[in-house]
Amino acid sequence: AYKIVTSQCTVCGACEFECPNAAISMKRGTYVIDATKCTECEGQFDKPQCVSVCPVDNTCVPA
């Protein structure tokens, strides 16, 4: 599963809508990834979609 580095997240929301597993949601003013839903997009995409769309490098990282 992946996680979002809260201190780097700009709360743009791009990742929430790109996640094919609906694993990303807003909690207490920032986005979080539900590890029980995150599959790292294996079998669906070449790399995790949160990583692909995030405008800030190294914000969506392996947990």
From Swiss-Prot:
Give binding positions for [4Fe-4S] cluster 2: C38, C41, C50, C54
Can you tell me which residues the record assigns to a coiled coil? none
Q: Does the keyword Mitochondrion apply?
A: no
SUPFAM superfamilies from the UniProt entry: 4Fe-4S ferredoxins
Keyword set for this entry?
4Fe-4S, Electron transport, Iron, Iron-sulfur, Metal-binding, Repeat, Transport
Q: Locate the 4Fe-4S ferredoxin-type domain: which residues?
A: 2-29
The record's InterPro entries line, in alphabetical order, gives:
4Fe4S_Fe-S-bd, 4Fe4S_Fe_S_CS
Task: Give the cofactor binding note.
Answer: Binds 2 [4Fe-4S] clusters.
**Names of required cofactors:** [4Fe-4S] cluster
**Residues annotated to bind [4Fe-4S] cluster 1:** C9, C12, C15, C19
Job of this protein = Ferredoxins are iron-sulfur proteins that transfer electrons in a wide variety of metabolic reactions.
Designated name of the protein: Ferredoxin-1
Organism of derivation:
Rhodopseudomonas palustris (strain ATCC BAA-98 / CGA009)
